[in-house]
Amino acid sequence: MSSERLPGKVLKEVNEKPLLLHQLERVARSKHVEKIVVATSTNPADDEIEKFAKKGNISLFRGSEGDVLSRFEGAAQESGATTIIRLTADCPLSDPEVIDHVITKYLEQPNACKFATNAIPRSYPAGLEVECFSREALEIASLEAKEDYDREHVTPFFYRNPHRFFPLSVVSTINYSKERWTLDEQSDFYLIKKIMEALSQIKVDFKMVDVLNILDANPDWRKLNSAVQETPRLVKDNIFKGADSG
């Protein structure tokens, strides 16, 4: 809720419903996700998130604002999860089929693989990122990660230590990396609002392909947030043991 660029962004409404609820409903359509936990901070600014969760009977965990890694570990411990899917709340267009695809690829790997992601190298639209990792990997990272960046962003420790976590990159057969469907600034909200309002009239459970189709039918929409600058990535693409197209 304390976002500097767009305060309160996850509770902004489209079709009279908070974006966070839109996302949770979409994630709940995953065939593999068994439990959803909203992991927010103890910052009083996030009290509204707690109210939202209680109203909707949604599982909630509150932890450190800056040490998000410890917050995730606390949420995992409380939920009893052994395999964890990390999604950020600024991605209201999360696609359950993409989530399931990453989970499936992760589960197909040998036990040595403790982390899978479709985020690096970027081939999916920004806003459809999925990270899947073991509880064991999370506990190791929480115990050993010392850099502030690693603790704030949860998974960089995995990227820094590929020889220990054997990260798997799940890559789309078509490169959609120029698509931006994440929520950081007001212009992002304008685009997401247009997409949701248009597609909700056609189908409730719209997928990535539906978003691509409606953007192709309305090419000017992409210009709405084309000026937004993405935060540079710290981790390079060449750390992965391999890429799995799909």
Question: Model-flagged regions — what are they?
Answer:
Residues 84-85:
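Short aromatic/hydrophobic "clamp" motif used to bind/position activated sugar donors
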